[in-house]
Amino acid sequence: EAYSEYTDCSGSNLVNMITHEHDRELMKLFDLEECYDKLPPLRNAADICGHVTKEASEKTGLPEGIPVAAGMFDINACGIASGLSDEEQMCMVAGTWSINEYISKEPVTNGTVALNSLFCMPGYYLIEESSPTSAGNMEWFIRNLMSYEKAEAKENGGSVYDITNEWVASIEPQDNNIIFLPFLNGSNEDPLAKGTFVGLTAYHNKKHMLRAVYEGIVFSHVTHVNKLLRNRERPKSVRLSGGAANSDVWVQIFADALQLPIDVIEDKELGAQGAAMAAGIAAGIYKDYQDAMRRTVKITKTIQPRPEYADIYKEKYAA
């Protein structure tokens, strides 16, 4: 038997956010009304929806008969694995996409945010802002402009990321006036937006350009966070995961630009961890999401903002 799941379907505009059920009027808006009666029943993320069959066991190596939970929307999984347990907290995922989110007992209905969806914890909505403007831009820079450094690092048993962090740390923000617009993969704001370096001169080198990439990605997150803050108070801190969280110098830029403490999450694959938390609840390993977060979510460090850098980044962001 097939099932659908609340967080995923609500994030796909297939669930009425008030009734929490599939909605014929929504389907009609998408010219999919004839599909309404074919939609599978909705289940919660930690509901058991079946068990591993013999055929599936033979193909995957998983033991036959173990329970299979519904799972959840990937941004829900990242949120719960970041420890979003109440309305005060906010988290960011700096991977290919710039994902920025918090949970609320009420949806945001004024059109100022990109997405409302049902959160995996009953009684909460996930309020989210995102765009494809995060650390994927740095991967493009490394692939196209740092092939020599990447090969050299590999030959010496190191990592190209050690080099990128060293380059960025060697330049103070006030000493670099290049602005990078991180739209290599497009933008939610303007379909014609493209990635751009602004302010390049003969004085600048790859180190200056890379510093601009780090900062431009942070500024994209700042844009999304500012939109979220139209509808809530500033949090006491922000939890960060994704590739950028592996770089202390990058995390410091986040803290300085936002002027908020940044809590770095220990785990690296938060989407998988969030799904595993739902499976653990389904299997009776965890009592509920609060128990799962208490037992699995770890903060490795907190990077404090430096007030003396606030105006520098504010001026750069305004540019």
Task: Tell where the protein language model's regions lie, with residue ranges.
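Glycine-rich loop at the start of a catalytic domain that most often binds anionic cofactors/ligands
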Residues: 83-87, 104-106
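Gly/Ser/Thr-rich active-site cleft segment
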Residues: 1-72, 138, 181-182, 186, ...
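Short helix-loop-beta connector
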Residues: 62-63, 85-87, 232-236
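Glycine/Thr-rich phosphate-binding loops that ligate phosphate moieties of nucleotide
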Residues: 16, 43-49, 70, 102-319
